[in-house]
Amino acid sequence: MSLSGGPAVEAVVINWKRPRNVAKIVDALRRQSVRPTITIVDCHPDWRYRLPRFTLAKADRVYRQHRNLGSFNRYVPVGAYDHEFTYFADDDMLPGSRCIEHFLDTKPAEFGVLGQIGRRLNADGSYSRRGVVRTEQLEPVDFLIRGYFVPTQRLDCVNRLRWQLGLQQEPSVEDDMLLSVAMELIYGLKSFVTPAHNDPESKQNKVELRARHALAKRPDHFDRRVAFLRQAKAAGWSSSHGLGWPAEGQDQVPLRYHG
């Protein structure tokens, strides 16, 4: 439960340049079988991307800021997050109506981050976009993308590791990786993809939305992610299944995408 005795989960979504997507996501969150508190972090750069008033009225909480920190914007109001769990939703997908319920039903007693789209390093330690196959049980992963279900009281680790790695001045942090790495390095908590479920309403990406302005389309996107993983490794992090690390100059292994 929240500190005020309300819902156990706070669902957070960023509005930057996809207000139509955010409006749809807010509606999908309001239809959840287990209703979360809905929070919008509104950091749109100009009037073209502002949210309609009816969407803002449907949210329980709205935080407005003018400095863009990329996906790290979701962590700026972390001092105000006061529910037992926080679900961070990317703004390019719609969850099914039982998505929050699914996370609550499948969470282990101790965990750092839960999600449904996970990544592990390749066998040679290089970065891969290949998704971890979900099975009938929780599967450990190195990090998750696009949606993150976390124990709120542990979120302080994100900024702690950001300072330790010297990323406090970085305008766009690889925040998905930072979240999982911080949970493991600071609290010893693992990240998992949840068990596969044949109910489409349990999916965090039941419907895919337009993904214009996506950070993944940056020309240096994978170089930045590899660079972050090197920093994490230097800080003591290792892959969830003890993989090695590529030698210098071996990062450009051909990447394959499997959904």
Predicted regions and their residues:
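N-proximal low-complexity "stem/linker" segments adjacent to membrane-targeting elements
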Residues: M1-A28
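C-terminal catalytic/acceptor-binding lobe
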Residues: G6, R20-I25, Q164-G259
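Short, acidic, metal-binding catalytic loop of nucleotide-sugar glycosyltransferases
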Residues: D27-T37
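A conserved acidic beta->alpha catalytic loop
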Residues: D42-L51
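A short, glycine-/small-residue-rich helix N-cap motif at loop->alpha-helix starts
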Residues: Q65-N73, S172-V173
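Active-site nucleotide-sugar/metal-binding loop of Leloir-type enzymes
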Residues: Y75-F85
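Conserved catalytic core of nucleotide-sugar-dependent glycosyltransferases
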Residues: V78, L94-G166
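Short beta-strand-to-loop acidic/aromatic patch adjacent to the donor-nucleotide binding site
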Residues: E84-L94
